[in-house]
């Protein structure tokens, strides 16, 4: 295949995956602004003011902030809140701001899960609601149809989405072309709406109606939901294809459609009940509902896949316990399925659909998670600009300060919607933050306890006398510590009075980069007396495979035969106590998560028939 064809294929794929969320925003953004919980009178002045706000919000928050500025802050090609967090963590190590910034990154990851629950619900609901334009009698079927579509979507996740994924690009290309054509068809009847490109309309609207415009910001931000996906998916497609797709198709199509809806409302204010599905003739409504449903399913799929990816990153970065990760493609390493994440999302999405009943009710819940994440991204990237890009402090203050001011304005406009549904992402964010920080703190306490009980390796080596027999073969002891003796080895010595001829003390560590190449995967040192220390390194986007890593040790003169290799694991049982460190309820939560974590043998892909587990009890 020629480079040109590969480039076109990558571009079409990027359009299918990256822009699904922001691409389906025209279904509800303008409708919610004029007819939502804080409705705005549909007058020409207000239409021009809102259109100007939408235009400049998209240009500043997506084009300038994400496409031009933040997409430069890649972590070895990867993007997203956790990749940005890992980059900032590395840059600020040893500084006072290190811990607060790390907590901000964790909050962003927590808010992401609230967002990933709301997106499938609001997207598919808004598409199916188009049936109400055909006849109001179909309103009763909107929620059941939405539930069926989403159930099928989540049910097929375990089979992989490779085959269906090939259709994503062409379908979304058709979607964006349809958005553009519908917009143009209405703009020709009221071309004066294009004057709203001037920022003076937005400024006048804000000064004439300060309270109304503040409420409007809470809905206008719906036009940029999914903008952060441009940065999140950068690792899959690269910076250039995403930028090319944005400027070449997605941005023009979105703006044309919003201005087309504005032109429609100038001629027919009653169309505000569902302006998107009123853009075309009546015969087009049903085909448009079908196309919109496909587009929203694709948008939902992108968010679900993103949730799997964030879960894997969080596990690797020590923020979540081990979970089962299934690779659904033999060709694409990034195509994974995380059962726990999938079904947690499914039940949450179903609860939202049944509980909120309409996209308008859900819109109030949507903005908080998105604006909160965007604001944190801006704060984190300010440190990248200052410490990595070496921007002048004045440039950082002006550029990042302006973006942060905009982020805060949108966040403030959404935080007032707590009672209307904004409580949901805050609740999910709080639960997620508690889980992430409890696991991180619990693991730190465990490491501290193990270090306190650790016996120096040289003491053990000196104690190896004639009473200790040497068994044939190799023993691999997995340990989180890079010094001292693993508890499993001490237990083996104490109870069996034997040590293997070759002992490999193995630590699997996660780098603050997305990928570690095979050439840098393993590092082995000879300690003496048949003992060796092995460090296996993986990136936070990779899944550990200990047997595969052992096969790379040939460069150190070591070969491993699985039939003569035994793996020794220490299985700790944690006992909550009143010792200082964590609140008792958090210790119990940590213990519960540990008991339900995927077994180390499964997670590290170790043959179960070659494993010996030795138990130990720890107070935390």
Curated annotation (Swiss-Prot):
One of its GO terms (molecular function) is symporter activity. It is found in: Cell inner membrane. Keywords: Cell inner membrane, Cell membrane, Ion transport, Membrane, Potassium, Potassium transport, Symport, Transmembrane, Transmembrane helix, Transport. The chain crosses the membrane at residues 7-27, 50-70, 102-122, 136-156, 168-188, 211-231, 246-266, 284-304, 336-356, 368-388, 393-413, 415-435. GO terms for cellular component: plasma membrane. It catalyses: K(+)(in) + H(+)(in) = K(+)(out) + H(+)(out). InterPro entries: K+_transporter, K_trans_C, K_trans_N, Kup. It comes from the Bacteria. It is a multi-pass membrane protein. Transport of potassium into the cell. Likely operates as a K(+):H(+) symporter. Belongs to the HAK/KUP transporter (TC 2.A.72) family. This is Probable potassium transport system protein Kup 1. The gene is kup1.
């Amino acid at each position: 295949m020629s480079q040109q064809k590969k480039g076109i294929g990558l571009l079409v794929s990027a359009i299918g995956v990256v822009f699904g969320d922001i691409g389906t925003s025209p279904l509800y953004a303008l409708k919610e602004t004029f007819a939502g919980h804080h409705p705005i009178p549909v007058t020409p002045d207000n239409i021009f003011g809102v259109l100007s706000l939408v235009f400049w919000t998209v240009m500043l928050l997506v084009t300038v902030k994400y496409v031009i500025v933040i997409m430069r802050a890649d972590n070895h090609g990867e993007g997203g809140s956790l990749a940005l967090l890992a980059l900032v963590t590395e840059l600020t190590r040893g500084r006072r701001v290190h811990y607060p910034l790390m907590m901000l990154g964790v909050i962003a990851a927590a808010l992401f899960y609230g967002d990933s629950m709301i997106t499938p619900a609001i997207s598919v609901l808004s598409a199916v609601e188009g049936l109400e334009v055909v006849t109001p009698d179909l309103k009763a079927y909107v929620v059941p149809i939405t539930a069926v579509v989403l159930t099928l979507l989540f049910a097929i996740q375990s089979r992989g989405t490779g085959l269906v994924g090939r259709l994503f690009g062409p379908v979304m290309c058709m979607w964006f072309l349809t958005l553009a054509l519908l917009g143009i068809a209405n703009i020709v009847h009221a071309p004066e709406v294009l004057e709203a490109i001037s920022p003076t309309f937005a400024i006048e609207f804000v000064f004439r109606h300060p309270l109304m415009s503040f409420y409007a910001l809470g809905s206008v931000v719906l036009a940029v939901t999914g903008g952060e996906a441009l940065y999140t998916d950068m690792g899959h497609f690269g910076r250039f294809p995403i930028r090319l797709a944005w400027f070449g198709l997605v941005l023009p199509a979105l703006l044309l459609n919003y201005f087309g809806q504005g032109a429609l409302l100038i001629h027919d204010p009653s169309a505000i009940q569902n302006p998107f599905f009123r853009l075309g003739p009546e015969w087009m409504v049903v085909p448009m509902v079908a196309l919109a449903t496909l587009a929203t399913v694709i948008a939902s799929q992108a968010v679900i896949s993103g949730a799997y990816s964030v879960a894997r990153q969080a596990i690797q970065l020590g923020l979540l316990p081990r979970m089962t990760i299934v690779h659904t493609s033999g060709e694409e390493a990034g195509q994974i399925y995380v059962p726990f994440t999938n079904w947690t999302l499914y039940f949450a999405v179903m609860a939202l659909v049944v509980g909120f009943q309409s996209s308008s009710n859900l819109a109030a819940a949507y903005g908080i998670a998105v604006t909160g994440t965007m604001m944190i991204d801006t704060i984190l990237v300010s440190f990248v600009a200052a410490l990595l890009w070496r921007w002048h402090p004045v440039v950082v203050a002006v550029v990042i300060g302006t973006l942060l001011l905009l982020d805060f304005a949108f966040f403030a406009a959404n935080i007032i919607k707590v009672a209307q549904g904004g409580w949901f992402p805050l609740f999910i964010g709080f639960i997620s933050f508690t889980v992430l920080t409890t696991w991180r703190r619990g693991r730190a306490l465990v490491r501290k306890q193990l270090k306190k009980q650790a016996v120096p390796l040289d003491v053990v080596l000196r104690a190896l006398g004639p009473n200790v027999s040497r068994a044939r073969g190799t023993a691999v002891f997995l340990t989180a510590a890079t010094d001292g003796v693993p508890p499993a080895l001490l237990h083996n010595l104490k109870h069996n009075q034997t040590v293997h001829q070759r002992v490999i003390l193995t630590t699997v560590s996660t780098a603050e980069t997305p990928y570690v190449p095979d050439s840098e995967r393993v590092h082995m040192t000879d300690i003496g007396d048949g003992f060796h220390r092995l460090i296996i390194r993986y990136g936070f986007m990779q899944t550990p495979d200990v047997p595969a890593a052992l096969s790379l040790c040939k460069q150190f003169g070591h070969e491993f035969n699985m039939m003569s290799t035994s793996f020794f694991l220490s299985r700790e049982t944690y006992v909550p106590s009143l010792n200082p460190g964590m609140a008792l309820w958090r210790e119990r939560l940590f213990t519960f998560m540990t008991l339900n974590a995927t077994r180390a043998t499964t997670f590290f892909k170790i043959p179960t028939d070659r494993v010996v587990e030795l138990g130990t009890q720890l107070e935390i």
